[in-house]
Every structure is written in structure tokens, then in C-alpha cells.
């Protein structure tokens, strides 16, 4: 009965979360070249320059409320369909879904309202620019949840920051500490990469799941606000992905990469938004 109810919830959540295509007036630029994730991931991790943290400015759930915010939190988000590439910092997002998908940028410690968001057509890639020194995360989602003024922390995070004091060097990782709603792959121009693309959201043991506000069942967060570990989802992430590729918690692995040219590329297989 539990499995039957879970299946019904998954179907209902998936239907509720399907986005409406923006349509011909979206003003989306032509797609950039799409990625070849198999080629990117063919580079062995022994050849990848990795860091446990490096210069990455990360969101810390146990300290966030006490931090002075480097940015003013947004009162309303900025919608883009794809930014002009003027040579500054930013990331490309390759949406591998067959349909439009939404991606939401949050400043660190600003959880209620995204700073910027973008809808990208299926099988296309767009560039999103960020200011010098930007630090935050990107999540997949839908407007009904991500733009409702409430924090939506549950899910996979692309954590990214740029160090303005050191040539605006970029740092990035994929974190599953606040949950896992699907794969993210991130890489730099040197071929260093982290993240995963395989589907890992089905078949996890009891205690590994949590429900997003839109009804989607995803892998639960691995760390609580007090820093204690939820071992069932953490161990599932280790088993299916590995701590050398993602943050499964704050104690394992070296899943951070850096870029000297202010740019990261990302590939997003379909998940549960």
C-alpha cells in the first residue's frame, strides 16, 4: 500500500510540475553547442584537479542565519532567456530534457527569492552571466514553487562562487547535502569535472525519500540543521554516485573544481523539478 501511494504521489507530482512552454515570445537566443557528457566524463578522476573546498564560498546551513550577507537579497527575481556573452563570468546550462525546464540562481543565505532564473528549451544550451564575485547556487525547479516567496532547499545544488580578490577565479561543486532531485554535471575548460548524470531517484530504501513542495519524491537531505547526518540517504548517494564526484556530506571527498577563465559549463539531465 505504501508503494502504491508513493507511485500515485509521483505521478501526481510529475503532472503538477510540468511547465508550460514560454512560447514564441520568449526571446530565447539561438542555442549554444550542446555538450557531450560521455566525452567529458571519460577523463578519469585521477587526472582531475580536485579540492575539498578550495576557494569555494559555500552555503552553511548551520551558520547561515548568523552570517552577514554579502549581497542584498532580491525583492523580485530577474527572468532571462539567455544572456549576452560579453566575456565576463558565468555558466552555460545544457538542458538535456525534451521539454522546457527552469533553473534558479540564489545568492548564498538568500533562500526565499531567486536572484535570477532562466527557462531553457529541451536539448538546448544557454549562457547565464553573473557579477564579479558572485557566490551562490543553482537549482532546478518550477515557478509555482521557486517563485512563491518560500525557501525551496530540497534538491540537488550546483554551488558556484567567484573570488574577486584573486582574479575572479571560479569554484564549483555539486552538492547533495540538501537533497538529490537529479543529476548535474559541471566542468571547466581544462577538462576537470564533477557531478553525475545517471538516474538514482528510484529504488532507494525506506527513509531515503522526502517530498518537495510540488509533490515530487526525491532523495532526502543528508545533513540536518544541527550538522547531524541522515545516514540512509547519505549512504545511498555514496553507493550510487560516490563522494569523489559530489558532496554527500561535509566530511567526505574532494568534489570541488576551479576555473581560471571565470566560466563553468553544466549539463542537466532530467530530474524531478
Per-region residue spans from a language model:
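Cleavable N-terminal signal peptides of Sec/SRP-targeted secreted and luminal proteins
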Residues: 2-17
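Extracellular low-complexity, O-glycosylation-prone Ser/Thr/Pro/Gly-rich "stalks"
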Residues: 18-273
